[in-house]
């Protein structure tokens, strides 16, 4: 049986001579490319489409692998595959000279930024540490202050203002 991902991979590996569309969102780009090049496509364009095709098939294969891996309860497979969808590019990575991005395995954006500058990787790391710690506190009764993913101030107090001040003083 040859179909689906096998056909996409076959076309993508022949990008020198083949245009592979793996997503309907690529139709417009193909139309522009064909109009720009009098009915032809250039190699750089075909390479970009091949890369996207391999990304799609790899993502698909990773989902299948993870399904069977979870079903067999294999905690430590010889090889492991992590996949996710881009949530956003961060202001920078762990250090200001690095690039960073946040990916989600469940396709949900779980954090909504209300104001301020774009978050960095470290900001997200601190957020997830704070969420993890706050889950251990009594509901609506505590504050945790986080620096570099480490708790540096914690207070349990039903009065939110007092709890914040106590946590800040314990830093």
Residue ranges and their predicted role:
Residues 2-3, 159:
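Secondary-structure junction/capping motif
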Residues 27-33, 37-171:
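Active-site loops and adjacent core secondary-structure elements that bind or stabilize anionic groups
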Residues 2, 9, 19-23, 42-43, ...:
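General beta-strand structural signal in soluble alpha/beta enzymes
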Residues 6-9, 156:
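Short, flexible micro-motifs
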Residues 3-6, 128:
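Active-site phosphate/pyrophosphate-handling residues
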Residues 13-29:
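Short, glycine-/small-residue-rich phosphate/pyrophosphate-handling segment
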């Amino acid at each position: 049986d040859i179909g689906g991902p096998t056909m996409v991979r076959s076309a993508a590996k022949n990008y020198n001579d083949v245009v592979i569309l793996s997503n309907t969102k690529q139709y417009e780009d193909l139309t522009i490319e064909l109009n720009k090049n009098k009915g032809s496509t250039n190699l750089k364009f075909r390479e970009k489409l091949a890369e996207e095709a391999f990304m799609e098939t790899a993502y698909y294969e990773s989902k299948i692998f993870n399904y069977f891996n979870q079903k067999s309860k294999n905690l430590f497979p010889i090889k492991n595959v992590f996949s996710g969808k881009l949530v956003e590019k961060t202001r920078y990575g762990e250090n200001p000279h690095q690039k960073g991005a946040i990916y989600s395995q469940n396709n949900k954006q779980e954090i909504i930024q209300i104001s301020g500058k774009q978050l960095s990787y470290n900001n997200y790391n601190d957020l997830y540490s704070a969420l993890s710690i706050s889950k251990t506190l009594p509901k609506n009764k505590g504050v945790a202050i986080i620096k570099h993913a480490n708790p540096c101030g914690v207070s349990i107090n039903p009065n939110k203002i007092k709890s914040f001040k106590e946590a800040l003083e314990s830093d």
